[in-house]
Amino acid sequence: VFIILLGTVNGANFTDGLDGLASSVTVLIATFFTVAAIGMGHNDLAAGIWPVSCATVGSLLGFLVFNVYPARVFMGDTGSLALGGFVAATALMLRLSLFIPIVALIYMIEVLSVMAQVLYFKMTKGKRLFKMAPIHHHFELSGWPETKVVAIFAITTAVCCLIGLVAI
């Protein structure tokens, strides 16, 4: 449980590096949890979670208006860490923690890319696996426009969330 919580919180924080990336990915994950909680029906815990999750979706959509490229408002560590905590806590309360690697795949990829970069750097005495970690910066340095990286990561998250909903 602790590893899931820590990994998700850090994954959300690592994802907050491009305009609109963390907020667009997290709004989709929060939508997944809203639909999942509503689908759980008469469960008292789920009945208390879906309004909070729905409010998170609404607040992120409002924030996203000002956070997309070129961003005028930035989330910062406080926001991204809080969103990671929200995702982890919601998954744990709904007993869907095994769904985090599916619906929050982007978070996991971001964390794993940083871990792989550090490990490879130490093992090869200074060589890099990626141009920069987390992986979204690698794509950006490879010439991808920031908006393309955000769009692809958001589409990937949407597909993963749909897979998660089908799996429930």
Task: Give residue ranges: language-model regions.
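Alpha-helical transmembrane segments
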Residues: 1-168
